[in-house]
Structure formats: C-alpha cells, structure tokens
Amino acid sequence: MERIKELRNLMSQSRTREILTKTTVDHMAIIKKYTSGRQEKNPSLRMKWMMAMKYPITADKRITEMVPERNEQGQTLWSKMSDAGSDRVMVSPLAVTWWNRNGPVTSTVHYPKVYKTYFDKVERLKHGTFGPVHFRNQVKIRRRVDINPGHADLSAKEAQDVIMEVVFPNEVGARILTSESQLTITKEKKEELQDCKISPLMVAYMLERELVRKTRFLPVAGGTSSVYIEVLHLTQGTCWEQMYTPGGEVKNDDVDQSLIIAARNIVRRAAVSADPLASLLEMCHSTQIGGTRMVDILRQNPTEEQAVDICKAAMGLRISSSFSFGGFTFKRTSGSSIKREEEVLTGNLQTLKIRVHEGYEEFTMVGKRATAILRKATRRLVQLIVSGRDEQSIAEAIIVAMVFSQEDCMIKAVRGDLNFVNRANQRLNPMHQLLRHFQKDAKVLFQNWGIEHIDNVMGMVGVLPDMTPSTEMSMRGIRVSKMGVDEYSSTERVVVSIDRFLRVRDQRGNVLLSPEEVSETQGTERLTITYSSSMMWEINGPESVLVNTYQWIIRNWETVKIQWSQNPTMLYNKMEFEPFQSLVPKAIRGQYSGFVRTLFQQMRDVLGTFDTTQIIKLLPFAAAPPKQSRMQFSSLTVNVRGSGMRILVRGNSPVFNYNKTTKRLTILGKDAGTLIEDPDESTSGVESAVLRGFLILGKEERRYGPALSINELSNLAKGEKANVLIGQGDVVLVMKRKRDSSILTDSQTATKRIRMAIN
C-alpha cells in the first residue's frame, strides 16, 4: 500500500509522467538490456556516437612519442587527458590517418601468407565469370554446405594443436602431432611465418580458416561446393539467380569430388569380388587421393554420399542415421513401424517376398534434383509433396516414393518378369527389382495409380499421370509444391555394422545402405587417384591391366623369383594375376597355363635354362587352372585394343618388348620399368650352369685336377670340389652344394665371387 502511495505521489509530478510516457525507454526489460553486461547491444549505434566525439579511440601511452600532437593542418591528434579507468591516452581518428600516411612501414611479405584465404578468394573472383540474371521462382532447400574454400580437413583438435605449435611454440601444454597432414602443415607454416610481425591472435584465426572445414545449414538452389557458396549472396535471391562460373578450384572441393569417385569405383569393384568386404578394405587402404591415403581422408572428411558412407562403415566409422533408397536420402521425421515378411503377386503373377513396414510414418526425401515429404501407412501412400528442378526430376521422386510405399496397385502394375541382377550377376532384392522396373518405364504405374479431385491450396498443384500440372485433378495423394524440403540438418553420427556383402545396418537392424544404392554416374576425378590394389587395374581398361601386371612382377621380382623356384603354386594363386585372366581368351586359358607351367618346371630342372625375361613374360598365363595337354605354343594371345595381340614365347613383340642393352621393358610401347636380369644369364647361360647348386670357392687350384667342362660337372658328388672352365675361358674352383635349399642364393652371390676369383 505504501509503495502505491509513493508511486501516485511521483506520478502527480508532471515531469515524471512526461518522462515515463514520452520517452521510448519505458520498459524495464529494455533498460536492463542496455545497461547490464559487458556485451555491446547496439554496436553500430555505439560506433556512430563514439565517432562523433573528438577522441573516441584509446591507445597505449607510447603513441605520444610516435605521433606528433598536431598534424600539418594544425588539428590535434591526441588529448593530454588520460582515459578514465586505464593508463591509456585518448586519441582522435585523425591520428589513424596520420599513422597510415606517415607511420613506419614494416615488411609486407607475410600478408599474402597469413591472409592466404582472402588473397585466394580475390583471385577466384577476379577470374570468375558472372553471367546474366534470370528472374524465376527459386526452389531453395537448406543443405549443409562448406562455407570455407581452400581448407585442409583437420579436426578441430588436430588444428588446435597445429596452431599452438606454429603460433605459440613456447606455450606450455602437451601437443601431439601425429597425422601426416598435421606434421606437413606445421613444418610448412613455421617456415612461411618466420619473423612474422602480424599479431599472433590474428595469425591463429587465419590458420583456423585454412585448416578446419566450417559448415553451415543454408538455403541453396544450385551448386553446393564451397566456391559457389562463397558467392551465394551474388548468385541467388528469392526470385532471381545469376549465372556464375568460379575462377578457380580449391583443394577441399577437389578432395570431396575425387573421394566420391574413388569410393564409387571401389564399392562397384568390391561388390563383384569373392569377398566384397575384405576386398573393399584392401582397396581403401591401398588407394591414395592427391597423394593422401584414402583412409586418412575418410576419417576426416564429412562428405555424405552412399559409396563414401559404405567405405566409412567398413572402417568402423560412424555415419549418418538416414538411409538411402533409389538415390534419395530418407530421414524418418515421425511415426514408427515393425517389419514383417509378406508374399505378394505381381501383375505377371510372379511371387515376390517383401519386407513390409507396418505402421504410420513420415519421411523427408532429399535427392540431387528433387525433394519431397512422404506420409505413408502400411502398404499405402497417404501423401507425397514433391518439389524439383524439372518434370524428369519430379517423376523420379514420385516413382521412388510409390515403390517405397509398397502399395498393391504398384506391384500389380508390373508387366513382364522381374529379373534384374547386380554387377556380380546376383539377383537384386525385390524392392530394388521393382524400382529398376519402374525406373525403366513408369507409364503403367502412373496410369493405374488413380486420380482424385483436389482443393486449391496456395503453392501446390496437382500432377496428372502424364506429368502435366493441373489445378483440378491429381494422381492420388500426390502434389507438386513450389517450396523445397530441407535436407536433414543434424550432424549426428551413429554406430553401424556392415556384412560381407557391404550391406550397412543400424543397431536396430534396418538396412541403411547397400551397393545397389551406389550411383553408376561416371565422372573424371580432379585429383589423381592412385589405386595400388590389383583389383582396380581394370578400371582403365585392358591395357592398364597388362602394364600393371608386369610392373607388379618387376617391382616384386626378388620375392617372386624365390617363390617361382620354391613354391610355384602359391605364386600362381596370387590375386595380382586375377585381372590378367580376363585378357586371355577363355577357351584356351587352361591350355596356355598347362603349357607355361610345364615350361617353368623344365627351367627348374635343367641347369642353365633360367631366363628372367621369359619367366616374367609368361608368368601371368600360369595363373589360370591348368589343363594338361601336349600342345606347344610359340605365341600366346591377349585381348587388348579391341583385338587379339600376340606375345611371343621366345623373343620380343609389340606387346612385350625387352631391350637387353638399356634393360628397359616396354609393354604396348609404354615404359614398364627396368628389369635387371640375373647376372648369371648375361654370359649366354654358361655361368648359370656353374652357379645353380655349386659354391664358388675362389681361383683355380691345380691339386683338384684339370678344368672340367660344364657338362662334366653333373657327375660330381655332393661336397666334392673341382676346377671348372666358365664364360670366356676363365677357370675357377667350385664345390657341389651339400644342401639343395641354398641353391637360390647362389645366383646372387655367384657373380661377386666369380669376379673376385678371376681378378
């Protein structure tokens, strides 16, 4: 009561009433907002009124020694009054102008290095091309995009360690630089930023821009790579778009693009091998993209694409919980269902076993060119709202949704038999069978779906079976909208499992991804992809298989040679010879293999017939299961360049050419590397007879009798010594080996010993 009296008393004074009613700040919340906390609430206003004052800036006392009190025009540059609450000086904006014109000049060498991201951006814009502006409705959908062109892909923690090491090397705190990229970047930046005078904090901020991927969830119509996002405000408005071609590529976009291509190639190749999961892992681990190991990129790169996610799942990494069907990413936004096996009959009376989802569910569907909201019940499509770039894209989304709904009229619309197979020639599962069928031709599906009258709803139109828009009628439950559906924004990742056929499931057992979902689109990678795995040799065609097979043998010749002599079967079964088999005509593979294996056996048995070039040349043919036959061949055929080409068993051919003088091997005219023959072969096979199975002891010793010829050697007993005539009439003392196992090393040690013995 007392308070009210007091207030009444206050209000009776006319001035109080005037203040409280006429001034805009009559709300406690507002007063509180502008008077509490250190955070500036209206920075631009503050800036304006500060700059209207004479000395709005405070500076260190040293400024008074470095800047004169007045400029040429006699205007005061700083005040003798010190700033309240600190020992700084009050300074006029004119002092800044004076400093910019007359102040000391420091080296500018570090600016382009520290502000690299900005300098690069200017270059891209300078060389970019802006096209015409078009006015049209923009279907924008929010997507998670990379807003920071030109960055490396370090995690926040890794980047923090690099920044601390580069900018504050003497600060305390444990920093562990482990990854290849961390070490390279640290070394590079330390060298670049030696004697850098730019404020360390600024350097740290700029480094962060260079090292870490920053993503935002933005409305986009059109290109989503970072070089397009940086000009988003210039290229698309609410009702207009401006054509733009970036003036340069950036490493991060190139990595994303090349990673997708590598992952697709690897998943497609793994799917057709005997053990898809093992093959996939082997390929991921042996592939490099732009010189960086693919597995390192997969660990750091957040790109979400079907093939990339399958590779990540195989490596035990978490991936997004959304699932993929028909090239669309589905995310359940509400509802739930249970799965039950059901048998259904197609229009052709073929029985299909499908896993029916029972229950009401809502999904968002996001594809490259169309998006949709889907509401479905058990085997019934309740509503589908689609938006897309064009008629074709909208139709694709409708087909996928109709198949996904599992409606009976869709299954009855099948004409003919369903027998689609995947790359490994295995039948696809029923849902993908249906999808492939209608993607080929959806006419019957759309005709049989049913039509309904529609109400006029803003921003929505109906669509008829021939895909024409209509305001009166529409296919049942289906509408086309002007507004896009946003991509799923969450960056949450879940633990998944993968089976040996590369099907990825979440912890409830729902299939999120399978090789069928991997796009068949072929692209050209922007960064060099190096597949070291023999499984990927065929990606560039038969010639590449041929060259790679021979290069592999040459690179591993030392081990191959030992296996050739001690454990040939193991050698013949090596997976590196698998791709080569596809080049050998099927009908004759077995005979070739039998012939080459027999030839090799003779080489092992008969001293002096070991021939490096010939073994390398014929080895890949021995890998096929051999057929025993008495056939002899003087040449073997391989299918390259669209026809059969011959490899001569003895001698050179355009396919396989070894130049003894230069020691270079060329395959189909392409250099395949240097081939060092065994030293014992160069003197026309004479020395090799000595070496294999004999130990050279030194110079000739008369007490062991006259020099024997090569042929007489075979009569020696194990451990017996003799003088032998070798090569160009030199005589050396040898001993027949007591053990056969050491025969192989003879070839290597022999030459040295012969040279020593002769000299």
UniProtKB/Swiss-Prot annotation:
Motif Nuclear localization signal per record, residues: 736-739
GO terms for MF: RNA binding; RNA-directed RNA polymerase activity
Native source species: Influenza A virus (strain A/Port Chalmers/1/1973 H3N2)
Subunit structure: Influenza RNA polymerase is composed of three subunits: PB1, PB2 and PA. Interacts (via N-terminus) with PB1 (via C-terminus). Interacts with nucleoprotein NP (via N-terminus). Interacts (via N-terminus) with host MAVS (via N-terminus); this interaction inhibits host innate immune response.
Primary location: virion
One cellular component (GO) term of this entry: host cell nucleus
Pfam families: Flu_PB2_1st, Flu_PB2_2nd, Flu_PB2_3rd, Flu_PB2_4th, Flu_PB2_5th, Flu_PB2_6th, Flu_PB2_7th
GO BP terms, alphabetized: 7-methylguanosine mRNA capping; cap snatching; DNA-templated transcription; symbiont-mediated suppression of host cytoplasmic pattern recognition receptor signaling pathway via inhibition of MAVS activity; symbiont-mediated suppression of host gene expression; symbiont-mediated suppression of host mRNA transcription via inhibition of RNA polymerase II activity; viral RNA genome replication
Name of protein: Polymerase basic protein 2
Compartment(s): Virion; Host nucleus; Host mitochondrion
Functional description taken from the UniProt entry: Plays an essential role in transcription initiation and cap-stealing mechanism, in which cellular capped pre-mRNAs are used to generate primers for viral transcription. Recognizes and binds the 7-methylguanosine-containing cap of the target pre-RNA which is subsequently cleaved after 10-13 nucleotides by the viral protein PA. Plays a role in the initiation of the viral genome replication and modulates the activity of the ribonucleoprotein (RNP) complex.
Family recorded in the similarity comment: Belongs to the influenza viruses PB2 family.
InterPro entries, A to Z: Flu_PB2_2nd (IPR049110), Flu_PB2_6th (IPR049114), Flu_PB2_C (IPR049115), Flu_PB2_CAP-bd (IPR048298), Flu_PB2_middle (IPR049111), Flu_PB2_N (IPR049106), INV_PB2 (IPR001591), PB2_helical (IPR049113)
Keywords for this protein: Cap snatching, Eukaryotic host gene expression shutoff by virus, Eukaryotic host transcription shutoff by virus, Host gene expression shutoff by virus, Host mitochondrion, Host nucleus, Host-virus interaction, Inhibition of host innate immune response by virus, Inhibition of host MAVS by virus, Inhibition of host RLR pathway by virus, Inhibition of host RNA polymerase II by virus, mRNA capping, mRNA processing, Viral immunoevasion, Viral transcription, Virion
Mammalian adaptation, annotated site positions: 627
